[in-house]
Amino acid sequence: MNIPAELKFSKSHEWVRLEGDEAVIGITEFAQEQLGDLTFIELPAAGDTLTAGEEMGSVESVKAASELYAPVSGEVTEVNLHLEDAPEAVNESPYDKGWMLKVKVSAVAGSLLSAEEYAALIESEAH
């Protein structure tokens, strides 16, 4: 399973790529594998404010529905609109074409995990 070392991860399986005061957010490869083929993604709009740890949207798949939780606080600056018509991009490329949001960060959740810590988390959840 691909767990990019340069990313941070939440316990609810969102990833964050911090780029200065901006963050790119998506869901992990593990999350999309557990959900199966995504059929619908609900995301906040540009200009909306996120609070770390609070709900920021949801995803639906052929198997399940799941809430998405903000790994950072801040203002949404961009939403990947391509996902409205092609939610399967998250299944095909969760860390690249399947990114969900860009956020101007005001605070980062203190509980974000390194790639190594996240690998241990999913290993424990698998058993």
From Swiss-Prot:
PANTHER family reported for this sequence: GLYCINE CLEAVAGE SYSTEM H PROTEIN (PTHR11715), GLYCINE CLEAVAGE SYSTEM H PROTEIN-RELATED (PTHR11715:SF3)
Function: The glycine cleavage system catalyzes the degradation of glycine. The H protein shuttles the methylamine group of glycine from the P protein to the T protein.
Obligatory cofactor(s): (R)-lipoate
Ranges where the Lipoyl-binding domain occurs: 22-104
Entry's cofactor comment: Binds 1 lipoyl cofactor covalently.
Name used for this protein in its record: Glycine cleavage system H protein
Record PTM N6-lipoyllysine, positions in chain: K63
GO process terms (BP): glycine decarboxylation via glycine cleavage system
InterPro entries: 2-oxoA_DH_lipoyl-BS (IPR003016), Biotin_lipoyl (IPR000089), GCV_H (IPR002930), GCV_H/Fam206 (IPR033753), GCV_H_sub (IPR017453), Single_hybrid_motif (IPR011053)
A Pfam match: GCV_H
Subunit-level organization: The glycine cleavage system is composed of four proteins: P, T, L and H.
Cross-referenced NCBIfam families: gcvH, PRK01202.1
Stated family: Belongs to the GcvH family.
Gene: gcvH
Annotated GO CC locations: cytosol; glycine cleavage complex
Keywords in alphabetical order: Lipoyl
